[in-house]
Amino acid sequence: MFDKTITRWGTHSAKWDLLAADLGQDALSLSVADMEFATCPAVSRAITRACEPGIFGYTEVFDDFREAVRGWQARRHGWSPAVGDVHFFPRIVQCVSALCAIVLPGQFGRAPRVVTLDPAYGPIIEVVERAGCELRRIPLDLSEGRVVIPERHFAEAMRDADLLLWCNPHNPTGRVWTSEELDMVSTLALTYGVTVLSDDIHADFQRPGRNGYRPLAIHSQQLWESGRLIQCSSPGKTFNSAGLEASAIVVRGVLGERLEEAKRLMGLHNPNFF
């Protein structure tokens, strides 16, 4: 599956056809948000089976989706969230939008103060800025050949913040954060009452022999039980299936209910048939 050349020109590809429209078909896309090899055969077979009846009506999320999320997390990462804590969003960036534009402004009566590491995923930054948030970007230290969080600046930014946009493994550097770094994040979040959204969409890409990924929810049970930690995952990167738009948002209690209300307000219901 990794040695077959697939041409994506003319398929309405955001990666290739948008580039061609701007720069011509000789341009080479260096984006890595999706890839040029096919998804695994099991995924293709499942989609083919879903197509066979020939009816593509409105669909709904049931507990089999939530059970699938819990099962994957348990098998791969040793974490078994409660089924009732699993919520569906098409894309993680839409969950960020719901938080920044609806949920947190409703809670505080103002635009939230948001902390993120820099560099960060561009569409998420755009959503935060368009929501009128105060964005605090903490540049990562790359001076010694590895990615390091400047702890003093990070702690200062967290002091009166409302939301931390965390990413593990980090996008775009690929850094998997250590136990000590996760300790720092959870301690600061608990100390200052900061909500944490952990975008773990790349969690299933791990290189053998490197620092292993661990969900923040496992690392800090106290932060998870506080109801201020949102764990986000998706098969989109792992299986090169971003166009199917399916993400799992796992969060405890009232915050999950508020995200569901915000999702309805955004007109997000009846997910993609696939």
Spans of model-derived segments:
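Conserved core of the PLP fold type I
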Residues: 56-187, 203-224, 230
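Residue-level marker for buried hydrophobic side chains located in beta-strands
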Residues: 168, 196-197
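PLP-dependent aminotransferase class I/II
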Residues: 61, 228-274
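Walker B catalytic acidic pair
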Residues: 200
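A general structural signal for well-ordered alpha-helical segments in protein cores
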Residues: 40, 44, 65-66, 182, ...
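The start of beta-strands in P-loop NTPase/AAA+ ATPase cores
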Residues: 162, 193-195
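N-terminal small-domain helix-loop-helix segment of the aminotransferase-like
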Residues: 2-94
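Short glycine-rich anion-binding loops that position phosphate/pyrophosphate groups of nucleotides
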Residues: 33-35, 168-172, 237
